[in-house]
Structures are given as C-alpha cells and as structure tokens.
Amino acid sequence: PDQSLYFANARFVEDHIFDRVQAGGPVRDVVLMCAAINEIDLSAVETLETINTRLDEMGVRLHLSEVKGPVMDRLRRAHFLSQLTGEVHLAQYDAFVALLPDAARA
C-alpha cells in the first residue's frame, strides 16, 4: 500500500540507507524507489537533503525513481531536485539501465 514519507518515518529511511551503504562493498549510487510514496512533508524533504549531502560526502550519488507527480511537485518547490547529486528516473528499470555501465566498471 502507498504511504507517506513524513517526520515519523523519515529517520528510519535515513538510518536504513546508511546501514546498507556502510555494510556492503564500495557503493557509487543509491536509488530510492519512490513508487509507494504518495505524500511527503517538509521534515521528510529535509531528511532527503541530509541523505543527499551525506552520501555526496561519501562519494555516492542519490537517485530517485518512480516519483509520483504530487511528490515531485513538492520536491521541486523545495528546490531539492536542483541539489540532487543523481538523477530522477521514470522507472526503477530505467535507473538500473542508466547506472549499469558505472556498476560494470567498478
């Protein structure tokens, strides 16, 4: 079921991303699949900004995929998209294909 990304669960998402990045081998890109996010509040946008900045400091790009229109509008109004170190992909598969050459060179 679709959910909101908001103050109560945004920190969980942040912790989960960094647990996964730090637990694995070298990571160059993180893709956050947003298909189930139907609403996002300002604190969640701020959390995404923090995730984007921290990943950038680690040399990792943050990408988004399958972002719904209203969520994309909120991210655009908050100027998050201009700060995003990666790309916004229409579909998760598109992100995979776009990033595959980078992964193959690693």
Model-flagged regions — what are they?
Residues P1-A106:
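Structured cytosolic domains appended to multi-pass membrane proteins
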